[in-house]
Amino acid sequence: MILLRHGESVWNLENRFTGWTDVDLSANGVEEARLAGKILKNEGYQFDKAYTSVLKRAIRTLWIVEEMMDLVWLPVEKRWELNERHYGNLQGLNKAEMAKQYGAELVHQWRRGYGIEPPPLDNSDPRHPRFDRRYAGLAPEALPASESLKKTLKRVIPCWKQHILPDIAAGKELIIVAHGNSLRALYKHLEGLSDQEVMELNIPTGIPLVFELDSAFRPTAHYYLADSEKSQVVIGDTAH
């Protein structure tokens, strides 16, 4: 199984909180996706199905990977549950500016804390997902106005158990293209990380992460498909 965080987005580049805002890839993000596809092809990976979110930066990353691997026919299941963590009223705001306004420690807790939710969107805010057509079929109470990583986990893990895991059990080779925090949530579940340990975990953009699973679907190994020097550089910190 391959986990892949989308390539760098325009708002990653601008150091903004992104969350559910549907921003596109930056030029560098497109190149990251192309490189990921090239690496996967060169390593001989083949897939039977792909999962992604309903946000274009993840979808476009998957498109590019498929094209690079000559897998444009690949069945794709788009799941809103794989969306990035919702950053509430912080979405669109610059993190450095927020640190000056609210203090670096509070902003760090908003970003990396496990159970802390950023200030929520008002229900009348046009940025609220209730006004977005792609979520029209969901119950209003399912749509977040803000999320902690803990809350994100509560939608990602049911998606894993109800949709992704049955495909793995059926013998399908999968690629999951999603977001920093939805992948952190899945990583926490798979590896049994503590709440404190997951706070220190960062998933870099555009680098394929391999998870090898045993017959009981427990991880036996995980590793990035990239040279160690690049991994060390990008794993440090990337805006969400």
UniProtKB/Swiss-Prot annotation:
Its EC number is 5.4.2.11. Pathway: Carbohydrate degradation; glycolysis; pyruvate from D-glyceraldehyde 3-phosphate: step 3/5. It comes from the Bacteria. It catalyses: (2R)-2-phosphoglycerate = (2R)-3-phosphoglycerate. The record marks H179 as: Transition state stabilizer. InterPro entries: His_Pase_superF_clade-1, His_PPase_superfam, PG/BPGM_mutase_AS, Phosphogly_mut1. The active site is at H6, E84. It is an enzyme of class 5 (isomerase). Substrate binds at residues 5-12, 18-19, 57, 84-87, 95, 111-112, 180-181. SUPFAM superfamilies: Phosphoglycerate mutase-like (SSF53254). Keywords: Gluconeogenesis, Glycolysis, Isomerase. PROSITE patterns: PG_MUTASE. Belongs to the phosphoglycerate mutase family. BPG-dependent PGAM subfamily. Catalyzes the interconversion of 2-phosphoglycerate and 3-phosphoglycerate. This is 2,3-bisphosphoglycerate-dependent phosphoglycerate mutase. It comes from Nitrosococcus oceani (strain ATCC 19707 / BCRC 17464 / JCM 30415 / NCIMB 11848 / C-107). The gene is gpmA.
